[in-house]
Amino acid sequence: MRSLLFSLTALVLAGCVQTPHKPMPDDPYYAPVLPEERAQPVVPTGSLFQDAYADNLYSDIKARRLGDIITVTLREQTTASKTATTETSKESTAELAAPTAFGRNITVGGNPLSAGINGTREFSGDGSSDQSNQLNGEITVTVIKVLPNGNLIVRGEKWMRINTGDEYIRLTGMIRPQDITAANQIPSTRVANARIEYSGTGSLAQVQEQGWLTRFFNSPIWPF
């Protein structure tokens, strides 16, 4: 009785487990990284050419340093489809001839003895699964680290307040400077180890979540 009560208590507690902590804006993990401070310019000497106004004639606007920003164009589209069909059948037959004694069939109640076994088993199963996802948009991220080979680690987030809820996009990943366009943009398909998160908070997001009692009945440990 005690073990049964303990099991029921565990089931109730499992169904009451709360969902993970809601994301909040201004997360320090996604805070922009400030660029490194440059050396102070030389004091003006009266010359026509001053270091404070010098620039590289062959430089471009592409992100390449710590703290630089770059715009990622979200072009994510995935489609998956799977179909499985299984059919099996098996048929077995066994017969035992009527026994004889002294050249005559042995009978019971005038009926000859005989035995036979027939068995048939069949199984048929079909399954299919289709899934499609699409995400379009733009998000501007910050270079948080420059690797020795020149690749850039980028990270950033964007929050949008819509009525009583918030929509947010978060992105982290690694990019190659060669993939950055002249407009300082890069498609999300060129981001390695990309982690893209798009979701929302507020009343609209809350109505899409299951209540604690529904989670209890839908938990994997529910025996029925």
From Swiss-Prot:
A cellular component term, taken from the record's GO annotations: bacterial-type flagellum basal body, distal rod, L ring
Mode of membrane association: Lipid-anchor
Biological process according to GO: bacterial-type flagellum-dependent cell motility
InterPro entries given in the database record: Flag_Lring
Lipid positions (S-diacylglycerol cysteine): 16
Compartment annotation: Cell outer membrane; Bacterial flagellum basal body
Signal peptide span: 1-15
Residue numbers with lipid attached (N-palmitoyl cysteine): 16
Alphabetic keyword roster: Bacterial flagellum, Cell outer membrane, Lipoprotein, Membrane, Palmitate, Signal
Gene Ontology terms for molecular function: cytoskeletal motor activity
Family stated for the protein in its record: Belongs to the FlgH family.
Subunit structure: The basal body constitutes a major portion of the flagellar organelle and consists of four rings (L,P,S, and M) mounted on a central rod.
NCBIfam families found in the cross-reference section: PRK00249.1-4, PRK12698.1
Protein function: Assembles around the rod to form the L-ring and probably protects the motor/basal body from shearing forces during rotation.
Name used for this protein in its record: Flagellar L-ring protein
Gene source species: Idiomarina loihiensis (strain ATCC BAA-735 / DSM 15497 / L2-TR)
Lineage: Bacteria, Pseudomonadati, Pseudomonadota, Gammaproteobacteria, Alteromonadales
